[in-house]
Amino acid sequence: MITRNRTSVLVLLLLSLLLQSCWNPFRPRMIDNSNDLIHNRTPLELLQNLERAYRERNINIYKSLLAPDFRFELISSEVNLIGIDVNEDGIRDSWWGFDEDVEFTDNLFNHGSTDGVYPSPDQITLRLMVPPEENWETDPELGHEDWIVIACNFDLTLTYLSSNSSLAAGGVARFYLRPSGNRWYIAIWRDESNL
């Protein structure tokens, strides 16, 4: 009887140790907030969500920020370097659309460079220096009367922990933001930086 009680106690003790070993108090369960609703109720909130999409490397958040007819535009000095032939006429274009931008950004977030030179970074930091609201502009183009144009200095840092290295870029991005319903979207992202 004593042996049976000892065996039962020993089995219960081992079972409780086994169950306890599955929980690590120094590594609590991660909470995924990426499914939180993205409201973009103001231009500032939209740009904060853009920083969040980069920080979390979340392509779904990123896509929710772009207008369906979104365009990424390059300055003319960059066209020969990074422009792509969007309309298949054999000439590099100074812009690309929603689908191409989502593909490029998904590669950045999750797969690395398309040429295989760079893996996906371990951390991405996009810091936008949003000017005060009184420095925002309205778009003078006909039909864009309710659009807001915000020129932001930015810093983008890609960090690679395994090689203890990082790539950094900075410059000016001009965002053309368009309201639709009670939300704001990026209609045009014009990169005004020199590479």
Label the model's feature ranges.
Residues 58-76:
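Short, well-ordered alpha-helical segments enriched in acidic and aromatic residues
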